């Protein structure tokens, strides 16, 4: 609802979902703690679409389905590289729920922090120029670091797809990192 409305009142959510406002407030508190929304007096606002926390909420169900499908490829003991992005963050989170022994290499400080404490995975964070909103490392140092690893799978995110031109990314520095 928030992805289409951008701002919604607690009372509207409670009525629409058929639950109490207390339940809605608890759920909104949990979403705010994850950085997905901001609570303001009597309503909730989705975080900026440039912010990774806010992007997770956009098309959440579709991204979660993609993450579950991608998880089916991964086996215990695999070394995988996960590029930054909201779908990739959900993939990393899903992996923590379904696997116990993985090595995850990422250029995303957000992903490293997002799964920290949820697993005993070895997490390798690649270095580079830090982009604060997306919490990702970019630039030639990332490319240099990547060349030092062999992985079983490499998962990347994309901002769009067109059948004529293929995949696209609105951030050239992020696109060049992978």
Description of each model-found segment:
Residues 103-110:
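Short internal beta-strands
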Residues 83, 106, 156-157:
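Short beta-strand segments
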Residues 32, 89, 163-164:
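Short glycine-rich, flexible loops that bind phosphorylated cofactors or substrates
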Residues 89-91, 113-114:
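Phosphate- and divalent-cation-binding pockets in alpha/beta enzyme and binding domains
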Residues 4-13, 18-20, 62, 110-178:
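Conserved phosphate- and dinucleotide-binding cores of soluble alpha/beta proteins
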Residues 3-11, 15-17, 21-84, 93-103, ...:
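HTH-adjacent hinge/linker in prokaryotic transcriptional regulators
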């Amino acid at each position: 609802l928030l992805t289409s409305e951008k701002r919604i009142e607690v009372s509207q959510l409670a009525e629409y979902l058929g639950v109490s406002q207390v339940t809605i407030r608890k759920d909104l508190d949990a979403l705010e703690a994850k950085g997905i929304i901001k609570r303001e007096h009597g309503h909730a606002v989705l975080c900026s679409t440039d912010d990774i926390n806010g992007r997770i909420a956009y098309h959440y169900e579709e991204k979660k389905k993609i993450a579950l499908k991608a998880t089916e490829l991964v086996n215990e003991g695999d070394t995988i590289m996960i590029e930054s992005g909201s779908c990739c963050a959900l993939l990393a989170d899903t992996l923590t729920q379904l696997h116990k022994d993985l090595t995850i290499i990422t250029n995303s400080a957000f992903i490293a922090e997002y799964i920290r404490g949820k697993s005993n995975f070895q997490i390798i964070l690649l270095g580079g120029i830090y982009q604060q909103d997306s919490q990702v490392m970019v630039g030639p140092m990332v490319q240099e670091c990547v060349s030092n690893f062999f992985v079983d799978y490499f998962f990347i995110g994309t901002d769009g797809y067109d059948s004529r031109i293929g995949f696209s990314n609105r951030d050239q520095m992020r696109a060049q990192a992978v």
